[in-house]
Amino acid sequence: MEMKQISETTLKITISMEDLEDRGMELKDFLIPQEKTEEFFYSVMDELDLPENFKNSGMLSFRVTPKKDRIDVFVTKSELSKDLNLEELADLGDISKMSPEDFFKTLEQSMLEKGDTDAHAKLAEIENMMDKATQEVVEENVSEEQPEKEVETIGYVHYVFDFDNIEAVVRFSQTIDFPIEASELYKNGKGYHMTILLDLENQPSYFANLMYARMLEHANVGTKTRAYLKEHSIQLIHDDAISKLQMIEMG
């Protein structure tokens, strides 16, 4: 297994078919997301010595490109939480009812009205972030000597969120009204942490950023990686944490 940083925001991880077989994985496992796919991504990230600027990212997206003798996993980190004041999202109204286009237009207009030209410029970068990451994948593949048959790229996104108490975790879970591929709940000291995996298949390029912004209305940006949580925290719910917490009624 090899890792190469191809840009400030994107890593390329190459995994041979032999490595896949050793992990009990097959190419078909990536076509239909399941628990073993989730664990595969997490285990790969746990084993690698990630660059410092990737270790504290609250959002990582995964895109898998199968090849004849290997798979290439492209990992892209988002800077959304560092460049936008997400507390101001409350001023935009109920963004859960907005289309992606309306969300970005409303956010852009809000920034312009407040004279936040720097954030406005950054928004344009964020809106194109996933498209640029895809282009990096294409350029990397084109640069290889042996042309290979074009295959569909499979994408996932991984989040980590922080919460001050269990009540906040339950409230967050009850706001989720879209499919979650996998979720876990951890306790570390006095705080709680949740990991979430989403499938990006058949979604627009800005879907990951939109979902991240929606969830940050009810959660804090993650300050720990899943690898850290698994080693230093108590895992309260191992899988399907969101749906299990949604069953709790709060007075």
UniProtKB/Swiss-Prot annotation:
Pfam families tied to this protein: MecA
InterPro entries, A to Z: MecA_C_sf, Neg-reg_MecA
GO MF annotations in UniProt: protein-macromolecule adaptor activity
Gene3D superfamilies noted in UniProt: 3.30.70.1950
Highest taxon in the source lineage: Bacteria
Coiled coil start-end: none
Transmembrane regions listed in the UniProt entry: none
Record text about domains: The N-terminal domain probably binds unfolded/aggregated proteins; the C-terminal domain interacts with ClpC.
Subunit note: Homodimer.
Family: Belongs to the MecA family.
Function: Enables the recognition and targeting of unfolded and aggregated proteins to the ClpC protease or to other proteins involved in proteolysis.
Alphabetical list of HAMAP family matching this protein: MecA
The protein's name in its UniProt record: Adapter protein MecA
Taxonomic source organism: Streptococcus agalactiae serotype V (strain ATCC BAA-611 / 2603 V/R)
